[in-house]
């Protein structure tokens, strides 16, 4: 049995991050019928479905329906998001019975050169992940930009520290260097993700 399987429910995204190579494919969103057909074929192959490859999953107009399908079929569902749409989708995620984990790529703010208010962005993320984590959903705040300029990291860490009333970077680390901000809510640090080069020779 595979540890996890990724399904791209949409290749549309509302950002253009420098760490993502994007796609030349036409914009496409998987229908609930297509999704259920695929999910049925994956039963017994894995317990965990990650609804993300390229694209922003929170852009899917029928995301609650997809999450209901995964729950009905017995999967544990994980989402990876840039976080910009969390204020809009928070209630839908809170009511989704099959959501197991939500990962938020905080480094997308810097990676996409967003010109908006970072504090407002972080507030929108925090106001979503806090009640989700309190409900028992695992929430990971990702800073996967080790080895890059990290221009926004100090402001992000300062914001998180203010929310928990202690220095987030002084919290104990696990074996992977991650820190627990509160129950079910984690800060993940890692090197910048490198997308596989499909044209590179096999090694």
Residue ranges of each PLM-predicted region?
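Conserved alpha-helical substructure of the radical SAM core
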Residues: 1-102, 113-117
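Radical SAM enzyme [4Fe-4S]-AdoMet core and its adjacent flexible, acidic
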Residues: 30, 73-76, 96-203
């Amino acid at each position: 049995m595979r540890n996890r399987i990724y399904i791209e429910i949409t290749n549309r995204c509302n950002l253009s991050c420098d760490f993502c190579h994007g796609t030349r494919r036409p914009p496409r969103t998987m229908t609930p019928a297509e999704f259920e057909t695929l999910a049925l074929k994956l039963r017994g192959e894995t317990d965990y479905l990650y609804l993300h490859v390229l694209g922003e999953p929170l852009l899917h107009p029928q995301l609650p329906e997809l999450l209901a399908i995964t729950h009905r079929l017995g999967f544990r569902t994980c989402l990876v998001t840039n976080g910009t749409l969390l204020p809009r989708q928070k209630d839908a995620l809170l009511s989704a019975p099959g959501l197991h984990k939500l990962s938020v790529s905080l480094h997308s703010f810097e990676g996409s050169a967003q010109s908006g208010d970072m504090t407002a962005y972080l507030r929108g993320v925090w106001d979503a992940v806090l009640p989700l984590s309190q409900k028992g959903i695992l929430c990971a705040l990702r800073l996967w930009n080790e080895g890059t300029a990290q221009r926004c990291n100090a402001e992000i860490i300062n914001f998180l520290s203010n929310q928990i009333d202690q220095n987030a970077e002084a919290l104990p680390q696990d074996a992977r260097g991650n820190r627990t901000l509160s129950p079910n809510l984690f800060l993940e640090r890692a090197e910048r993700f490198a997308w596989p080069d499909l044209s590179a020779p096999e090694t």
